[in-house]
Swiss-Prot record:
<keyword id="KW-0067">ATP-binding</keyword>
<keyword id="KW-0234">DNA repair</keyword>
<keyword id="KW-0547">Nucleotide-binding</keyword>
<keyword id="KW-0963">Cytoplasm</keyword>
<dbReference type="InterPro" id="IPR020588">
    <property type="entry name" value="RecA_ATP-bd"/>
</dbReference>
<dbReference type="GO" id="GO:0005524">
    <property type="term" value="F:ATP binding"/>
</dbReference>
<dbReference type="GO" id="GO:0009432">
    <property type="term" value="P:SOS response"/>
</dbReference>
<dbReference type="InterPro" id="IPR013765">
    <property type="entry name" value="DNA_recomb/repair_RecA"/>
</dbReference>
<comment type="function">
    <text>Can catalyze the hydrolysis of ATP in the presence of single-stranded DNA, the ATP-dependent uptake of single-stranded DNA by duplex DNA, and the ATP-dependent hybridization of homologous single-stranded DNAs. It interacts with LexA causing its activation and leading to its autocatalytic cleavage.</text>
</comment>
<dbReference type="InterPro" id="IPR027417">
    <property type="entry name" value="P-loop_NTPase"/>
</dbReference>
<keyword id="KW-0227">DNA damage</keyword>
<dbReference type="GO" id="GO:0006281">
    <property type="term" value="P:DNA repair"/>
</dbReference>
<dbReference type="GO" id="GO:0003684">
    <property type="term" value="F:damaged DNA binding"/>
</dbReference>
<dbReference type="InterPro" id="IPR049428">
    <property type="entry name" value="RecA-like_N"/>
</dbReference>
<dbReference type="GO" id="GO:0016887">
    <property type="term" value="F:ATP hydrolysis activity"/>
</dbReference>
<protein>
    <recommendedName>
        <fullName>Protein RecA</fullName>
    </recommendedName>
</protein>
<comment type="similarity">
    <text>Belongs to the RecA family.</text>
</comment>
Length: 343
């Protein structure tokens, strides 16, 4: 078959497919209108840089997992706030029945515009999510959490009844159904997940996430979030030092990490990240305990500089802009190459 005949045969096949399934159902990759991946900021400057595209990708499944009280819900509330700033409509499926509206408001979430559902069963939660995604009007949906998506059979059964892998089957079926809708409607779908311990693991990491393996495969980005220390004001604990690691990334190189502070009552400390990344990129100078910007001292001690940046937002925004411009030069934000690469 000559090249001309091949081209005619392909053109005829493409025309037949479009006739059967609609325009745009098949095309050459270079003809796609949006080749660049759009992203929504996470609310953390360091994590945006670690993700490689300035935030979480639109039209993809994201998994955020970690131990209890590590900042999973806080990070997702920041995601909602950032999406709303861009005019997006967000939904929160609260399967844990634990969302605090007052805390969400403090983090910048417009709770009057946030759609919330507190379903009774896992099937109900995922059906609600599917309906909202297929509507095409939702820009971001959060499901909190996978562990709380209890199958109907388990709720209606007796305590102690064996329900072998019923949650894993539910998640596998739901993700098969949701994936195409998520991509078509460009909706960011974030699953919060918990950590469990595998029994009898002698070597390697005994930790695993709930809900089986389906979510690990379908997720384009998986973020591991951990609390690594406390932030104290004299004797009072006022926040948590947090480390996040991008353990899977289909849109940029994975295994990058970022550190940030989560302050109780106000969420991720943007000013703390600006100081740390500013020093790392030689934008902010550090001499002893003093910090300087443009040869002007802006404070002694990290907490004082954070307060200075809060009081001078124009300087804070200026430093942040320079950090984002230089971020392409950062190949490493505490880059942590571990055994997980070989998992």
């Amino acid at each position: 078959m000559s090249n001309t005949d091949k081209e005619r045969a392909i053109a005829a096949a493409l025309a037949q497919i479009e006739k059967s399934y609609g325009k745009g159902s098949v095309m050459k990759l270079g003809q796609r209108p949006n080749i660049d991946i759009e992203a929504v900021s996470t609310g953390s400057l360091g994590l945006d840089i670690a993700l490689g595209i300035g935030g979480v990708p639109k039209g993809r499944i994201i998994e955020i997992f970690g131990p209890e009280s590590s900042g999973k819900t806080t990070l997702t509330l920041h995601l909602i706030a950032e999406a709303q700033k861009k005019g997006g409509t967000c939904a929160f499926i609260d399967a844990e029945h634990a969302l605090d509206p007052a805390y969400a408001k403090k983090l910048g979430v417009n709770i009057d515009e946030l759609i919330i559902s507190q379903p009774d069963t896992g099937e109900q939660a995922l059906e609600i999510a599917d309906t909202l995604i297929r509507s095409g009007g939702i820009d971001m949906i959060i499901i909190d959490s996978v562990a709380a998506l209890v199958p109907k059979s388990e709720i209606e059964g007796e305590m102690g009844d064996a329900q072998m892998a019923s949650q894993a089957r539910l998640m596998s079926q739901a993700l098969r159904k949701l994936t195409a809708s998520i991509n078509r409607t460009n909706c960011i779908t974030v699953f919060i997940n918990q950590i469990r311990m595998k029994i009898g693991v002698m070597f390697g990491n005994p930790e695993t996430t709930t809900g089986g393996n389906a979510l690990k495969f379908y997720a384009s980005v998986r973020i591991d979030i951990r609390r690594i220390g406390s932030i104290k004001d004299k004797e009072e604990v006022i926040g948590s030092q947090t480390k996040v690691k991008v353990v899977k990334n289909k849109v940029s190189p994975p295994f990058k990490t970022a550190d940030f502070d989560i302050m109780y009552g106000s969420g991720i400390s943007k000013e703390g990240e600006i100081i740390d990344l500013g020093v790392k990129l030689d934008i902010v100078e550090k001499s002893g305990s003093w910090f300087s910007y443009n040869n002007v001292r802006i404070g002694q001690g990290r907490e004082n500089v954070k307060q200075y940046l809060k009081e001078h937002p124009q300087i804070s925004n200026e430093i942040e802009k320079i950090i984002r411009e230089k971020s392409s030069k950062i190949t490493n934000i505490n880059l942590d190459q571990t055994e997980e690469e070989n998992d």
